[in-house]
Regions:
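Intrinsically disordered, low-complexity regulatory segments
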Residues: 51, 59-62
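Polybasic phosphoinositide-binding surfaces of eukaryotic membrane-targeting domains
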Residues: 62-96
Length: 170
């Protein structure tokens, strides 16, 4: 489940895609997903993860809640084309026992994002964020866009961030 190092979902040592305004699903990951009807529907593409939520809409009493629970650990995120950070626990709407990759946070046949990776929470507070997505493989330069969105969020919700918040470059 997630962004492994090898196979169609990992970089296998090749790293990220070249810097771009947006990133589509890496070709080998997309092809592997198209071969799995519980991940990718030929008519509709990726289904939307039922827990996907814009991060500011997940704030409850100065912490994040996803599907009614306070996250404690890594959660998937994407920065969509509208400068919104979408977060969600791994939840496949077709088959809950199957994996739920980053493209399911936005859904569709050809999803594009500005960045994607993992946000780590401790008791619902943001601790760190990275660009580790085996499906989109965003360039680390794209993290600046994420940082800008988080700075705005921090300005209006300073207690949402852990005192140990750090920026993990990858």
């Amino acid at each position: 489940m997630g962004s492994g190092s090898y196979g169609p979902y990992g970089s296998g040592g090749s790293g990220s895609q070249p810097y771009a305004d947006t990133y589509g699903v890496y070709p080998s990951a997309l092809q592997a997903d198209k071969n799995d009807k519980e991940i990718y529907d030929p008519q509709k593409g990726y289904p939307v993860n039922p827990t996907a939520k814009e991060i500011s809409h997940a704030i409850v009493n100065e912490h994040i809640e996803i599907a009614g629970k306070i996250p404690d650990g890594p959660i998937t995120y994407v920065l969509n084309e509208n400068n919104e950070i979408i977060i969600g626990k791994r939840s496949n709407p077709i088959n809950p026992s199957k994996r739920s990759p980053h493209p399911m946070l936005v859904g569709g046949k050809d999803p594009h994002v500005q960045c994607a990776g993992m946000i780590t929470f401790k008791k619902g507070k943001i601790v760190s964020i990275d660009n580790q997505s085996g499906h989109f493989r965003p360039n680390k330069k794209s993290m600046e866009k994420v940082y800008q969105v988080l700075k705005k969020l921090q300005g209006s919700n300073p207690k949402l961030f852990s005192n140990s918040f750090n920026w993990r470059e990858t």
